[in-house]
Amino acid sequence: MKKIEAIIKPFKLDDVRESLSDVGITGMTVTEVRGFGRQKGHTELYRGAEYMVDFLPKVKMEIVVTDEQVDQCIEAIMETAQTGKIGDGKIFVYDVERVIRIRTGEENEDAI
């Protein structure tokens, strides 16, 4: 099993969620986050003064999938979240040792 974390632009969330649903992903956790990478933020003008905005709003999606679903999940995120512009985000893939559904006690792939 793998955990996929995708940091994407907030306006892409609904499209990515729909794309993941189309490939059989039934659950995820979404968190509003702020950060920056190579784009380093931007400047904004407010009441005549310029301000540096270091951390940009992003959305972090966390999805646990079977090993067989990993490539399909990554492909769905890439195709949907990519704009071709700086700040599209990143995808991280981690190993998951064990999953337990609290309500039923089911474990691992049965609990996903």
Swiss-Prot record:
SMART domains: P-II. The keyword Chloroplast does not apply. The modification O-UMP-tyrosine is found at Y51. InterPro entries: N-reg_PII (IPR002187), N-reg_PII-like_a/b (IPR011322), N-reg_PII/ATP_PRibTrfase_C (IPR015867), N-reg_PII_CS (IPR017918), N-reg_PII_urydylation_site (IPR002332). GO terms for cellular component: cytosol. Signal peptide: none annotated. Pfam families: P-II (PF00543). One of its GO terms (biological process) is regulation of nitrogen utilization. Disulfide bonds: none annotated. Uridylylated/deuridylylated by GlnD. GO terms for molecular function: ATP binding; enzyme regulator activity. Keywords: Nucleotide-binding, Phosphoprotein, Transcription, Transcription regulation. Homotrimer. P-II indirectly controls the transcription of the glutamine synthetase gene (GlnA). P-II prevents NR-II-catalyzed conversion of NR-I to NR-I-phosphate, the transcriptional activator of GlnA. When P-II is uridylylated to P-II-UMP, these events are reversed. When the ratio of Gln to 2-ketoglutarate decreases, P-II is uridylylated to P-II-UMP, which causes the deadenylation of glutamine synthetase by GlnE, so activating the enzyme. Belongs to the P(II) protein family. This is Nitrogen regulatory protein P-II. It comes from Pasteurella multocida (strain Pm70).
